[in-house]
């Protein structure tokens, strides 16, 4: 009898050990998930990072007007610190902000903006990226990367944890898969939106009680481009013939459109834009030091006519609707085409009207 009892005791002891081990494992497993212990903590060298590589490229980007793929969720574990040099004017910094946000998400990194960019954009938009403190910026072992102005495959697999981007990226190929998120980041503050809508409400056509049904924002880029484009880039800015053709395009497709003109050259606009049809309103203040009033006005319109430049691009991108842009505005041998790809600059559904390059041929004659 004794040997049998001894075997029973041994089996019972082993069973208790197994049950205890299972109970302990289940307790630890449950507690780990209760406290957020995931693979990123258990394997700190291999953070749980989701790379939405499939949506960075053109085939994964929505091609129909004003649509977007669902905003990708933030990866479960973001690491590193990425930022971008704030350079250029208002539209340039919008492009830099959107590109930083998109590339950081794509590579599972935390994005921060520098104080100068916050100072330029935060008074206008409800941006959410945190600001990098100057002392952190000064002590971070940055690797620097200058971006060209279109999305490239290598930008989807950047392994640097501390990366400072630079350049003037403003291409939809970087961020169009995040269209709704970008539009949310660039939501106007209420007072700017309400002021712009108030201006539009005051516009009338014909009889005082008739309100126009369709507003077309018109941005005419002039200023320094009058010299830069022909002298440096063998290019032109939009002329009166282009603006007339663009307006006629909308007149043929929309009932009683009203053209709301803004520019950093309002005097030229008043002297050169045909107002004989009574549907053109000069509403911009042309103040380059405070561009947000004109920008807010353009984004509240239904459609857009742009000439060249990032200011017009962003106004059109945020307004939605139809967009007409100035196409082929440089000579074929322009150096500008080495840094600018039209197919990456203008959305496929936008409508291009070719520029008149004859003034450049005149300049080229001996």
Curated annotation (Swiss-Prot):
One of its GO terms (cellular component) is Golgi cisterna membrane. Disulfide bonds: none annotated. Residues 26-366 are lumenal. It comes from Alouatta caraya. Belongs to the glycosyltransferase 11 family. GO terms for molecular function: alpha-(1,2)-fucosyltransferase activity; galactoside 2-alpha-L-fucosyltransferase activity. Its EC number is 2.4.1.69, 2.4.1.344. Glycans are attached at residues 66, 302, 328. It catalyses: a beta-D-galactosyl-(1->4)-N-acetyl-beta-D-glucosaminyl derivative + GDP-beta-L-fucose = an alpha-L-Fuc-(1->2)-beta-D-Gal-(1->4)-beta-D-GlcNAc derivative + GDP + H(+); a ganglioside GA1 + GDP-beta-L-fucose = a ganglioside Fuc-GA1 + GDP + H(+); a beta-D-Gal-(1->3)-beta-D-GlcNAc-(1->3)-beta-D-Gal-(1->4)-beta-D-Glc-(1<->1')-Cer(d18:1(4E)) + GDP-beta-L-fucose = alpha-L-fucosyl-(1->2)- beta-D-galactosyl-(1->3)-N-acetyl-beta-D-glucosaminyl-(1->3)-beta-D-galactosyl-(1->4)-beta-D-glucosyl-(1<->1')-N-acylsphing-4-enine + GDP + H(+); a neolactoside nLc4Cer(d18:1(4E)) + GDP-beta-L-fucose = a neolactoside IV(2)-alpha-Fuc-nLc4Cer(d18:1(4E)) + GDP + H(+). Catalyzes the transfer of L-fucose, from a guanosine diphosphate-beta-L-fucose, to the terminal galactose residue of glycoconjugates through an alpha(1,2) linkage leading to H antigen synthesis that is an intermediate substrate in the synthesis of ABO blood group antigens. H antigen is essential for maturation of the glomerular layer of the main olfactory bulb, in cell migration and early cell-cell contacts during tumor associated angiogenesis. Preferentially fucosylates soluble lactose and to a lesser extent fucosylates glycolipids gangliosides GA1 and GM1a. One of its GO terms (biological process) is regulation of endothelial cell proliferation. Pfam families: Glyco_transf_11. This is Galactoside alpha-(1,2)-fucosyltransferase 1. Coiled coil: none annotated. It comes from the Eukaryota. Residues 1-8 are cytoplasmic. It is found in: Golgi apparatus, Golgi stack membrane. The chain crosses the membrane at residues 9-25. Pathway: Protein modification; protein glycosylation. Keywords: Glycoprotein, Glycosyltransferase, Golgi apparatus, Lipid metabolism, Membrane, Signal-anchor, Transferase, Transmembrane, Transmembrane helix.
């Amino acid at each position: 009898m004794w040997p049998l009892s001894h075997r029973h005791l041994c089996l019972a002891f082993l069973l208790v050990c197994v049950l205890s081990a299972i109970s302990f494992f289940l307790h630890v497993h449950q507690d780990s998930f209760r406290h957020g212990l995931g693979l990123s903590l258990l394997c700190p060298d291999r953070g749980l990072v989701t790379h939405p590589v499939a949506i960075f490229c053109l085939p994964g980007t929505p091609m129909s007007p004003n649509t977007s793929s669902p905003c990708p969720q933030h990866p479960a574990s973001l690491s590193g610190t990425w930022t971008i040099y704030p350079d250029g004017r208002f539209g340039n910094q919008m492009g830099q902000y959107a590109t930083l946000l998109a590339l950081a998400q794509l590579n599972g990194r935390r994005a921060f903006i520098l104080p100068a960019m916050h100072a330029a954009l935060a008074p206008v938009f409800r941006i959410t990226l945190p600001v990098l403190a100057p002392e952190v910026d000064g002590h971070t072992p940055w690797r620097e990367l200058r971006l060209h102005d279109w999305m490239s495959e290598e930008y989807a697999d950047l392994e640097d944890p501390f990366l400072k981007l630079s350049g003037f990226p403003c291409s939809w190929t970087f961020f169009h898969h995040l269209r709704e998120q970008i539009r949310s980041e660039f939501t106007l503050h209420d007072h700017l939106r309400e002021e712009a809508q108030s201006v539009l409400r005051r516009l009338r056509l014909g009889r005082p009680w008739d309100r126009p049904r369709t507003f077309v924002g018109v941005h005419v880029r002039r200023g320094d481009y009058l010299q830069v484009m022909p002298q440096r880039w063998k290019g032109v800015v939009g002329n009166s013939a282009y603006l007339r053709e663009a307006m006629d395009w909308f007149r043929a497709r929309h009932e009683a459109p009203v053209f709301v003109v803004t520019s950093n050259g309002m005097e030229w606009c008043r002297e050169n834009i045909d107002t004989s049809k009574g549907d053109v309103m000069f509403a911009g203040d042309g103040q380059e030091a405070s561009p947000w009033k004109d920008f807010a006005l353009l984004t509240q319109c239904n459609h857009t006519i742009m000439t060249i430049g990032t200011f017009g691009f962003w106004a059109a991108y945020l307004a939605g609707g139809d967009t007409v842009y100035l196409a082929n505005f440089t000579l074929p041998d322009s150096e500008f085409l080495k840094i600018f790809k039209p197919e990456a600059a203008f959305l496929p559904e936008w409508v291009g009207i070719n520029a008149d390059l004859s003034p450049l041929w005149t300049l080229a004659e001996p």
